[in-house]
């Protein structure tokens, strides 16, 4: 995503935060963010040490996602019986482009139909049926929804993913911690966190599991209609039987996961991680 020189969402956020601080009567010599800090974030020289999280970038959002829908209708019959049937299916993807959310979907399969019979000049019958199968899969988001987090998450707080290769080879304790975690993303990133953000929506979507929802609905009714006008003008008799069945269930895989707050150092102009703190997350 965008890494223009001397621009970042974080730098813009911190600059505006300082302005609000001054407007509220804060002292110039006590700004929350120094000019050097803002420069480091604006330079984009190390987006892992100085993150600028853009929830709307192509790192996280697809340019487009698919919705597929197909349906078919069948009808026919003769003077004794007529029938109609409709079959439809749709599947909806998701615009999130990372972690388990890449596999999010909603789908529905529906079949409905009816048959009308003429049994005699005074008796007719009907049968109606409908069946719907609905399913959805989504990544767990324990920290409210992605879009809610996009509105409230501070862009400078946490780098969602940090390369393992940035850990100093001599930082044995940090390497041991990383070796013990089961959540190394794509074989090369660990999940970032901080004491203020023990977990976050990115970690959720990468590592906290999934939820699969299914529902089944079935409706059926059938009846007979009798014309008894030969007995008494306007007299008729109707019978009906109906069944309405529905069931729903969810299968959820809920995982806890560790995030790591790095301690950075600079050796000969190169940023390296010399320590990690999981802040109690596991």
Tell me what each language-model feature is.
Residues 90, 95-108, 130, 138-140, ...:
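Small-side-chain secondary-structure face that scaffolds active or pore-lining regions
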Residues 222-224:
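Short, hydrophobic/aromatic-enriched beta-strand segments in well-ordered soluble domains
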